[in-house]
Amino acid sequence: MTKDRLAALHAAQSDDEEETEVAVNVDGHDSYMDDFFAQVEEIRGMIDKVQDNVEEVKKKHSAILSAPQTDEKTKQELEDLMADIKKNANRVRGKLKGIEQNIEQEEQQNKSSADLRIRKTQHSTLSRKFVEVMTEYNRTQTDYRERCKGRIQRQLEITGRPTNDDELEKMLEEGNSSVFTQGIIMETQQAKQTLADIEARHQDIMKLETSIKELHDMFMDMAMLVESQGEMIDRIEYHVEHAMDYVQTATQDTKKALKYQSKARRKKIMILICLTVLGILAASYVSSYFM
């Protein structure tokens, strides 16, 4: 009896340990996904910040180009915005690459679960959004470069030194502002201001080209990632759309069924009422007959 009692206690203890282990695993799983979604929100917030900064950069570009003279304060604010974009973009890229590596490790281990699919979908969505924002930033930088070129070209025409696009590009490749001022006589204050503006625009272009080159590798890396994920996202969107169509069809069928059910119910009620009335009439007739 003592041995049997001891064995039962050991068995009960083993069951408790298994239940505890399962509970711990479940809690750990929930905690892992909570941490993942917190990371997703953090990345989304950083992408939104980059997007807001890109819009501010556009405003600064317009302010600089519309000003008759170079505003150093505005230019410094523009440089600060560009530095902030670069910092946040690098952080986003690093976090997305980290998620990508974790997903690849699980796929190599032949792990497949709903959580893995969720993480892949979230990663793809964030990557696409990030590439869209950075594409807009790249477009903004390129557009500003062209506008600066146009302003330099107009200013050179004012100083009596007209240039075409090819000549201007060659001048820009020199990387030296003095290329634009060679042979120009600065007799008036207006001429000096014009040349100063040309040099300022040239410096802007040089900074832009540096910024664009720094972002190029990041942009290509993320663009290739999104392209490789495109087919998967398209499949997800396809199934979601068809699921919505199915839900709408099912809803319509349900409404029809309810409508037919309601009609059938009304028919049953009418038949019961008729039978009741007929029963009352028959009873009245029989009772009057025997009386």
Curated annotation (Swiss-Prot):
Pfam family, one: SNARE
Region (Disordered) residue spans: 1-20
Annotated keywords: Coiled coil, Cytoplasmic vesicle, Lysosome, Membrane, Neurotransmitter transport, Phosphoprotein, Synapse, Transmembrane, Transmembrane helix, Transport
Protein localization: Cytoplasmic vesicle, Secretory vesicle, Synaptic vesicle membrane; Lysosome membrane
Tissue specificity annotation: Prior to embryonic stage 12 expression is ubiquitous, then it becomes concentrated in the neuropil. In third instar larvae, expression is seen at the synaptic boutons of the ventral muscles. In adult brain, expression is seen in the optic lobe neuropils.
Parts of the chain on the Vesicular side: 290-291
Gene Ontology terms for molecular function: SNAP receptor activity; SNARE binding
Domain of life: Eukaryota
GO cellular component: endomembrane system; lysosomal membrane; plasma membrane; SNARE complex; synaptic vesicle; synaptic vesicle membrane; terminal bouton
Residue ranges of every copy of the t-SNARE coiled-coil homology domain listed in the record: 195-257
Cytoplasmic side: 1-268
InterPro entries linked: SNARE, Syntaxin, Syntaxin/epimorphin_CS, Syntaxin_N, T_SNARE_dom
Transmembrane domains' residue ranges: 269-289
Topology in membrane: Single-pass type IV membrane protein
Keyword rRNA-binding tagged: no
SUPFAM superfamilies: t-snare proteins
CDD domains named in the record: SNARE_syntaxin1, SynN
Residue numbers of Phosphothreonine PTMs: T70
Residue ranges of coiled coil: 33-117
UniProt keyword annotation of Membrane present: yes
GO biological process: cellularization; exocytosis; exosomal secretion; haltere development; intracellular protein transport; liquid clearance, open tracheal system; membrane fusion; mitotic cytokinesis
PANTHER family recorded: SYNTAXIN (PTHR19957), SYNTAXIN-1A (PTHR19957:SF424)
Family: Belongs to the syntaxin family.
Role noted for this protein: Plays a critical role in several secretory processes, including cuticle secretion and neurotransmitter release, and probably assists in neuronal membrane maturation or the final stages of neuronal differentiation. Essential for embryonic viability and development. Required for coordinated peristaltic contractions. Recruited by Unc-13-4B to secretory lysosome-related organelles (SLs) that are essential for tracheal lumen fusion between previously separate tracheal branches (anastomosis).
Protein name, as recorded: Syntaxin-1A
